Swiss-Prot record:
One of its GO terms (cellular component) is cytoplasm. SUPFAM superfamilies: WD40 repeat-like. Residues 1-33, 364-388 are annotated as: Disordered. It comes from Mus musculus. This is WD repeat-containing protein 55. Keywords: Cytoplasm, Nucleus, Phosphoprotein, Repeat, rRNA processing, WD repeat. The modification Phosphoserine is found at S355. Nucleolar protein that acts as a modulator of rRNA synthesis. Plays a central role during organogenesis. WD repeats lie at residues 37-76, 83-122, 126-164, 167-206, 209-248, 251-290, 293-333. Residues 370-379 have a biased composition (Basic and acidic residues). The keyword Acetylation does not apply. Residues 1-20 have a biased composition (Acidic residues).
Length: 388
């Protein structure tokens, strides 16, 4: 459990026990849990909805569940599963936290018991192509997307899929759901944002294709905006109910944006191939700073803890890292026209982000990139959205 959530120990009236306790070294409490070192890079990452547990699926097909703590030496592996035959690409906990759903390049869906790590159900050949993403709809329903653009809706109580559609031409990189759990949004390698009505089990539309792969998708601004990361390092914004074309685009100083995770309604974090985890404000569009990095190794996945205090990241360095979100969650960007000084470093937003004498302090955002947030194509209703 996080130190802020732990109850203070009751006072012990026994003087002898107090003397014994005083001889023990007090456990060191860190700002974040210690790094977890794996034997292979993790491509799937998920926090438990209520407990201090982190699940990871790696490229060897192994799935792990860890208990994490800020008390030094207390972060540990609870169990692992090697049932997948190929790379585990995504993991997600059920709403009640009792099940863990995993999908793999081996085309299978696995449902495991969180307490014991036992495989409760295997759906072999769930797709005709390797599965790349999974999204939980409710306690019974889930959606999966594969490498050829196929989307399938499943009810865990039934055998076959409830919905099977293939509107995209390339892999399904990421998916998101509106709060009403009616519309499914899909980011695809074909550069299109897809919209599916899973309540009525029908396809709605595809957006105009962008110049790069869409690698990630998230709802922002209380559902008024949809943000998509791309392989070209650009964040594309869509208005809700205006999915046909982008309303804004925002280029980062990054080769690509491989994953994004919302932190607040205005702020999100991005993971890129340069190993940098950037904090980005949406409308006004600006890189706020850096949360951390994986020493130049690509960032594969990001996840936010149930309490919102920690961001977890996995990289090609085979490490799972934790980052403190406390400072970032207090950031407010309200000066739209202010520009960063030329050659200035990215602002450090956590104690573990690089300092001025660090190797990564050489990373600079030049003036051209500083202008990028302000040189976006804007729809007429964007200013109204930003003022809400």
């Amino acid at each position: 459990m996080d130190p802020t959530c732990e109850e203070s120990p009751a006072e012990d009236s026994n003087n002898e026990e107090e003397d014994l306790d005083s001889t023990k070294a007090a456990p060191r409490i860190r700002d974040t849990p210690e790094d977890i070192v794996l034997e292979a890079p993790a491509s799937g990452l998920a926090f438990h909805p209520t407990r201090d547990l982190l699940a990871a699926g790696d490229v060897d097909g192994d799935v792990f569940v860890f208990a994490y703590s800020c008390q030094e030496g207390e972060t540990k592996e609870l169990w692992s599963s090697g049932h997948h035959l190929k790379s585990c690409r995504a993991v997600v906990f059920s709403e009640d936290g009792q099940k863990l759903v995993t999908v793999s390049k081996d085309k299978a869906i696995h449902i495991l018991d969180v307490e014991q790590g036992q495989l409760e159900r295997r759906i072999s050949k769930a797709h005709s192509a390797p599965i790349n993403s999974v999204l939980l709809v409710d306690e019974n329903a889930l959606v999966t997307g594969d490498d050829t653009g196929g989307i399938r809706l499943w009810d865990q109580r039934k055998e076959g899929p409830l919905m099977d559609m293939r509107q995209h031409e390339e892999y399904i990189a990421d998916m998101a759901l509106d709060p009403a759990k009616k519309l499914l949004l899909t980011a695809s390698g074909d550069g299109c944002l897809g919209v599916f009505n899973i309540k009525r089990r029908r396809f709605e539309l595809l957006s105009e294709p962008q110049s790069g792969d869409l690698t990630s998708v998230a709802l922002m601004k209380y559902g008024k905006k949809v943000a998509c990361g791309s392989s070209e390092g650009t964040i594309y914004l869509f208005n809700w109910n205006g999915f046909g074309a982008t309303s804004d685009r925002f280029a980062l100083r990054a080769e690509s944006i491989d994953c994004i995770v919302p932190v607040t309604e205005n702020l999100l974090c991005t993971g890129s191939t340069d190993g940098i985890i950037r904090a980005v404000n949406i409308l006004p569009n600006r890189v706020v700073g850096t949360v951390g990095q994986h020493a130049g190794e690509p960032v594969e996945a990001l996840a936010l803890s149930h309490c919102g205090h920690f961001l977890a990241s996995s990289g090609h360095d085979q490490r799972l890292k934790f980052w403190d979100m406390t400072q970032l969650r207090t950031v407010v960007v309200d000066d739209y026209r202010r520009r960063k000084k030329k050659g200035g470093p990215l602002r450090a937003l956590s104690s573990k982000a690089w300092s001025t004498d660090d190797f990564f302090a050489g990373l600079r955002e030049d003036e051209e990139d500083a202008k990028a947030p302000e040189e976006v194509v804007r729809e007429s209703d964007d200013d109204d959205d930003d003022s809400d």
